[in-house]
Amino acid sequence: MAAKDVLFGDSARAKMLVGVNILADAVRVTLGPKGRNVVIEKSFGAPIITKDGVSVAREIELKDKFENMGAQMVKEVASQANDQAGDGTTTATVLAQAIISEGLKSVAAGMNPMDLKRGIDKATAAVVAAIKEQAQPCLDTKAIAQVGTISANADETVGRLIAEAMEKVGKEGVITVEEGKGLEDELDVVEGMQFDRGYLSPYFINNQEKMTVEMENPLILLVDKKIDNLQELLPILENVAKSGRPLLIVAEDVEGQALATLVVNNLRGTFKVAAVKAPGFGDRRKAMLQDLAILTGGQVISEELGMSLETADPSSLGTASKVVIDKENTVIVDGAGTEASVNTRVDQIRAEIESSTSDYDIEKLQERVAKLAGGVAVIKVGAGSEMEMKEKKDRVDDALHATRAAVEEGVVAGGGVALIRALSSVTVVGDNEDQNVGIALALRAMEAPIRQIAGNAGAEGSVVVDKVKSGTGSFGFNASTGEYGDMIAMGILDPAKVTRSSLQAAASIAGLMITTEAMVADAPVEEGAGGMPDMGGMGGMGGMPGMM
């Protein structure tokens, strides 16, 4: 086992604070509308220029192992805030630095670290409650656009696109961010249910210009098995041919004689048909077929339920107003399923989300909810260079998370004003003097974000804090224009969830660091240790002539 270095007490905390300050100082310069850029070197390719706090934090690794531990713990603050609300990483880092530096001063002055932590926790709980009281619902498109704009560093186009996407696919809809091909940002909305399976044969294509299969008012056959026997399909095909409507077959697979017959009948014009593979794999495929059945008002033909294709009733077929299939995707628009059955299914999936512990499963379940309840919107980010593209994509991702958080828990006045207003409504008292010091230092730290926003904008932080404190309600400092006024009226809003999560993450890690009494790290390996001994030069070569 490698030798370890151990530090105790004040010397451990001092080292830790150095690391905290290095990381936080690099991250906090990005805060606010006038936040500065940070340039990050990459081992391969061009450097990255970013204003995203968590991207800066992730890149920082310090040489000194004790200092690095401090930096990594603050990095955890940014990650926690990002995981909970998807934004607010820089605010969380600024708050953590303020609480930690004040807290460690108090510990050095001889105060009880555990009481300080209890005081910080009490103050945090009181401020969180005050933020929740300040929150106003964020329901209209204008407010959503304003939140998106603020989070995307005052990029109004991004805010507008996110609001438009939410309006079109609903609050439950899937909104994804992709790299676009041009200079302009674009919004692409897919209405209806889309899944990533294309046609099984190009001979099904009926729109040669777009290379797609398009069906109006089709019948939809859903089968939970592989179809390769034509005899199984014949009864259904005869019924469909009589109806004169097109048929879409969604099955585990369609191959061999069955697929060949479908292709031949389609080419001859006997009836219009197309086949696609069912989405997903294993149990997820079964669940998604059931989703499709509920959406289209049909039934899954499953041998597990004692059903077979030969005996399938025409009433088990689903319907939709339109189906569009290309090489990679199938879109079912306006399925005939009842709203009540769709809502019941959505509630059922949401219950699964609540009980699931796997991030991957939760993501897939949320996608299913979105496909049933809303739709899918893709924001395509445009930029002039690859560097700009990466930076902008990060900002759009942040803005998207912020707007979702705003819809979830409402909005508060932005620019650090919500934390300042929370101070005036908090009346919490500790059980002893050391707890009161913890409460006081945590409340004082609430001023740190507005000081930093003002400082990054070239204003004097203390002057701005005093002026904002003298006002009431949503009166604050607009760092973008350098003016004071009503933040909500000016459209400067923060999601309450982001502000709350930032504070809770900062207080949690700060409490742990203040109560740290010892640090253990690998001792540095001395240069040359464990290598081969010195050979002492090569003697005895004296008589050789010099080489030209």
Swiss-Prot record:
Keyword Nucleus tagged: no
In its UniProt record, a GO molecular function of this protein is: isomerase activity
| Superkingdom of source | Bacteria
Keywords of the record? ATP-binding, Chaperone, Cytoplasm, Isomerase, Nucleotide-binding
List localization entries.
Cytoplasm
The record's listing under CDD domains reads:
GroEL
GO CC terms of this entry: cytoplasm
- Which sites bind ATP? T30, L31, G32, P33, K51, D87, G88, T89, T90, T91, G415, D494
Its GO biological process annotations read: protein refolding
Q: What class of enzyme is it?
A: isomerase
Which Enzyme Commission number(s) are listed?
5.6.1.7
* InterPro entries cross-referenced by the UniProt entry: Chaperonin_Cpn60_CS (IPR018370), Cpn60/GroEL (IPR001844), Cpn60/GroEL/TCP-1 (IPR002423), GroEL-like_apical_dom_sf (IPR027409), GROEL-like_equatorial_sf (IPR027413), TCP-1-like_intermed_sf (IPR027410)
Write out the catalysed reaction.
ATP + H2O + a folded polypeptide = ADP + phosphate + an unfolded polypeptide
Q: What does this protein do?
A: Together with its co-chaperonin GroES, plays an essential role in assisting protein folding. The GroEL-GroES system forms a nano-cage that allows encapsulation of the non-native substrate proteins and provides a physical environment optimized to promote and accelerate protein folding.
Q: Which protein family is it in?
A: Belongs to the chaperonin (HSP60) family.
Subunit structure of this chain's protein? Forms a cylinder of 14 subunits composed of two heptameric rings stacked back-to-back. Interacts with the co-chaperonin GroES.
Q: What is this protein called?
A: Chaperonin GroEL
What organism is the protein native to?
Answer: Oleispira antarctica
